[in-house]
């Protein structure tokens, strides 16, 4: 499975927003999740059964709409030779469009990650949770909490903590038994501590090195002082993992609950890492802006003009940007106009209005997503595209003060 680009993630998120907003009457919207290992023949048989059961629905309108949606699915499945590697999801049903009217709508999604469970769902809204989960961060971090008595090793995958192994030591307490000199006892104790640290390092290295190198973003170590500092200083982890240690954090527990404590303690660090690339790009933009170097552009008009002359080095687009470039035309006098519409999920499609020249009705001839347009222009000129979250101050400022569109230029253009 190939990793989604930032633009693909944006498009996927936008599509789910659109589906989330659609509502049906009663249970007229069908969601069908088909994993790769599911036989199409079996799915078809179940849909035929559901079609038969729908005949018992008392409301004639609901019965007609549900059976119509199932018939639409059966028709689509006839042309599906093989389920894609990641599975396939169908959404279909009579969507309420207001004024006591409905519209039969369908959407097909090839998910970015494999579907693991087959599901047929009939409700007044589409079932989106499995796909929305795919939008969540899947970055992986190695977790290790330890003291001289115990250690627990785990992974943080996205927001989910997985405990893999718990180790206990044979390190004796600080009080020596009778018959041993204090010096000899201390030597044996240090050897036992070293051996335990080595055992922890070997076990943690085995677990962390099994994660794909590009997916493992770093290693977090927790525990009381001075244990975690001793372990870190002794370089007991594989040398590649040693380079990925992001920090040492105080935790009171070293069992499985200590892993949760470690993640909470490192929360700010993890968020900074997740947003670091975005933060750096936005800060570079503000640096150039404050320096008045002329190597920045912001706002739709300025940035579009610089993209068209291949002057953009880094294009910054807010993840919350929702804008369409609408073209309207008059078929009578030939008047044409292009304008940008900012929108929110659930808002109706743009209306054309009347021609300012002759008064005739205008026609919407083209609608293009501004993000799609700008991403395509950036791709043609090899400009880097950075999608920026509003979860940090500068990202929020990019959206609110600059309309969610800005650029760092290769040279000053005066445009």
UniProtKB/Swiss-Prot annotation:
InterPro entries: eFR1_2_sf, eRF1_1_Pelota, eRF1_1_sf, eRF1_2, eRF1_3, Peptide_chain-rel_aRF1, Peptide_chain-rel_eRF1/aRF1, Ribosomal_eL30-like_sf. It is found in: Cytoplasm. Its main location: cytoplasm. Directs the termination of nascent peptide synthesis (translation) in response to the termination codons UAA, UAG and UGA. The gene is prf11. It comes from the Archaea. This is Peptide chain release factor subunit 1-1. SUPFAM superfamilies: L30e-like (SSF55315), N-terminal domain of eukaryotic peptide chain release factor subunit 1, ERF1 (SSF55481), Translational machinery components (SSF53137). GO terms for cellular component: cytosol; translation release factor complex. GO terms for molecular function: sequence-specific mRNA binding; translation release factor activity, codon specific. Pfam families: eRF1_1, eRF1_2, eRF1_3. Keywords: Cytoplasm, Protein biosynthesis. It comes from Methanosarcina acetivorans (strain ATCC 35395 / DSM 2834 / JCM 12185 / C2A). SMART domains: eRF1_1 (SM01194). NCBIfam families: aRF1_eRF1 (TIGR03676). Heterodimer of two subunits, one of which binds GTP. The keyword Cytoplasm applies. Belongs to the eukaryotic release factor 1 family.
